[in-house]
Amino acid sequence: VTYRFRDLLALEPLSAAELTFLLDQSKSFQEIQRHPLKKLATLRGKTVALAFFETSTRTRISFGTAASRLGADTMNLQAEASSLKKGETLLDTAFNLNAMKPDCLVMRHAASGAPDYVARHLDIPVVNAGDGTHEHPSQGLLDALTIRDRKGTIENLNVTILGDLSHSRVARSNIHLLGKFGCRFTLCGPAMWVPRELEKIAPGTPIRSVYKIEEALED
């Protein structure tokens, strides 16, 4: 299996085979965690730019740690201390980062579609670390890998997602990924947090909405 895309902007367009390829690659790197020396040479000589235009702790540190453990150097853009505060546009900021010749850009932004917009103007791979209410591909992959590790499979499972799903980019990535493996979804939360349009975001994937946790846990 080959990965068709230069970037990782969303899970929705990926096939089950491509998702399995990414999960298997991720699994192969888990062993690093158990090594006394947590370092590989996979990305030696490469530089990963981290541009988080929205507050992040776990995702930013996780990407930085992953890059370091795979041998890459990192450069960090602190949005609150950048020229964005002086009126520089997002695209100009991206061009300036690109001029420093990183090999990859990891980007989080509050606007849905911002990483895709930037990726169309740069000549390096862009990884979406969360954009608005659109998607959070890396978290979706991590969730699927965790489920596969614990359950032994991600196929044909009943999956319940609870909380404020109207704003959850993670829930959308979970649905797009796991739905390709025959999973069925129950979405649960107060009615204002579970918009019915979520039932239609992945055609062919069974999705139902309920508003009581007892109903959500029936299956």
Describe the predicted segments one by one.
Residues V1-I61, T65:
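Positively charged, low-complexity intrinsically disordered leader regions
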Residues F53-T65, D149-D219:
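Glycine-rich phosphate/diphosphate-binding loop of Rossmann-like nucleotide-binding domains
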